[in-house]
Amino acid sequence: MLVPSDMIAAQSKMVYQMNKYCADRVQVRKAQIHKQIQEVCRIVQDVLKEVEVQEPRFISSLNDYNGRFEGLEVISPTEFEIIIYLNQMGVLNFVDDGTLPGCAVLKLSDGRKRSMSLWVEFITASGYLSARKIRSRFQTLVAQACDKCAYRDIVKMIADTTEVKLRIRERIIVQITPAFKCAGLWPRSASHWPLPGIPWPHPNIVAEVKTEGFDMLSKECIALQGKNSAMEGDAWVLSFTDAENRLLQGASRRRCLSILKTLRDRHLDLPGNPVTSYHLKTLLLYECEKHPREMEWEENCIADRINGIFLQLISCLQCRRCPHYFLPNMDLFKGKSPGALENAAKQVWRLTRIMLTNVRCLEEL
């Protein structure tokens, strides 16, 4: 197929603009975040060392692997989440019956005594390992550790939340979340994935992702708020971070995500936080399904993919619903105010219009 020369010229210009944007904006953002990560992890490691002295069951899994920290998630340049993996689910069964959107429970196996569990005092009368009880104990230990650690002058616990959150130097927020890793399991609520008839991802990658499994996090679940569920405090939030990261390997998908995050931080960091980097990551995964071929993710296609993701984001904001990639019954906009979502839709449309109509737009963005 012959392609008009002016289209090739426009594509070449956009590739040049994208490369320049990555060098001028994306890499600067990454360097700033890397610097923050080094300090954040140094402080949190010191706090967790103190926690472990008080309570050996909470062993820090925050280890440095060639500059990468396992369990560290960047929410924004000033907000981080650190997952601490707990030991020995042991005598507990994973129960996912769909009654708790985005969540599941851990229940004592039939015939097993509480005393056989490492976490005996956090098991309820009904035999459930309570996420809230474990988090409450962990929060107390972290608060005590903050008062004793070497960085006590610059690190403070954030009050008025059941989450374990620290404020460092008054400007960085770090959430520390206890979790269990569920390898070799795949939740029933995500059993529909991947959808039949869609060629992405490749079956080998699907098998790899499902074998790797998922995490269960002890944190507040927005999907359950207001439901007055008796299970709300005992439930664990399902997390697929490793699966999502595995799916985004190859071609320019990771690069696309880095550009989206940079655009979000610079132009869509709005009141009420209606658009997060996780929303963009989710829509990127849906875009991968729409464009399954590797050639559709080469550098000359990135601008089209980003515009497609922003148009989908506008649609989600206007409908006030953004379905989770693996758990589509879970709405990632739940808890966001209609006004904040409406304002975000206007801002995203303004940004998209600039990108669609100006080949040199990235010089200003």
Swiss-Prot record:
SMART domains: Mab-21 (SM01265). It holds the Pfam family Mab-21. InterPro entries: Mab-21-like_nuc_Trfase, Mab-21_HhH/H2TH-like, MAB21L/cGLR. It comes from the Eukaryota. Belongs to the mab-21 family. This is Protein mab-21. It comes from Drosophila pseudoobscura pseudoobscura (Fruit fly). The lineage of its organism: Eukaryota, Metazoa, Ecdysozoa, Arthropoda, Hexapoda.
